[in-house]
């Protein structure tokens, strides 16, 4: 599927403003440019950014909206662990800003080049989030929502990041084919 077709599918899935689409288009170009300097995303997904990365990330906006409403409208704190190229954190920042959802997004990545990339995206797009260049287990704060894509096994993630989670926290962890096995293995540590 070419870029125009991907954008059409994205627009069919998500009703977003022209301004949001402009920011996402600029973001796509910056990812492609940044990929030359630093491995931001898998090479095989470079031609599929709109569906593989943007649409995947945009799915979380519904969760963010629901948590925001259920919290009585308070500003949320979201942590994106191992943010890399900024999925889902940057996409959520763009979309939440457009919908005026009060959210403090923290993107954490231990890779300095990726953290610098995320800072440059923030300036270029004029979006609001915080970039932290360290390992997530070294962060001393609790979050309402915690996201991670392609970081580590569920058990390892929970062991390393238990200090970030409170009882009410919502974890959105993108997992692969073996997700059921990972959940069963992790049930010994956490109640689902």
Locate the predicted segments by residue.
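Conserved S-adenosyl-L-methionine
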Residues: 80-84
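Class I SAM-dependent transferase core
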Residues: 2-73, 79, 112-127
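S-adenosylmethionine
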Residues: 96-106, 110-192
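Residue-level signal for inorganic ion chemistry
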Residues: 31, 92, 174-175
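Conserved active-site region of classical short-chain dehydrogenase/reductase
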Residues: 58, 90, 155
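The start of beta-strands in P-loop NTPase/AAA+ ATPase cores
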Residues: 75-76, 170
């Amino acid at each position: 599927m070419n870029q125009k077709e991907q954008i059409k599918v994205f627009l069919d899935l998500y009703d977003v403003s022209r301004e949001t689409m402009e920011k996402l288009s600029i973001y796509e170009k910056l990812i492609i440019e940044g990929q030359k300097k630093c491995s931001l995303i898998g090479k095989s997904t470079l031609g599929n950014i709109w569906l593989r990365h943007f649409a995947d990330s945009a799915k979380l906006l519904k969760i963010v909206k629901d948590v925001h409403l259920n919290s009585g409208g308070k500003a949320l704190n979201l942590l994106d662990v191992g943010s890399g190229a900024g999925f889902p954190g940057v996409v959520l920042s763009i979309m939440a800003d457009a919908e005026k959802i009060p959210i403090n997004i923290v993107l954490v990545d231990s890779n300095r080049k990726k953290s610098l990339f995320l800072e440059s995206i923030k300036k270029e797009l004029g979006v609001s989030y915080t970039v932290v260049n360290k390992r997530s287990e070294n962060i001393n704060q609790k979050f309402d929502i915690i996201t991670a894509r392609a970081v580590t096994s569920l058990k390892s993630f929970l062991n390393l990041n238990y200090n970030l989670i409170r009882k009410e926290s919502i974890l959105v962890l993108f997992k692969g084919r073996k997700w059921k096995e990972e959940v069963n293995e992790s049930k010994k540590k956490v109640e689902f």
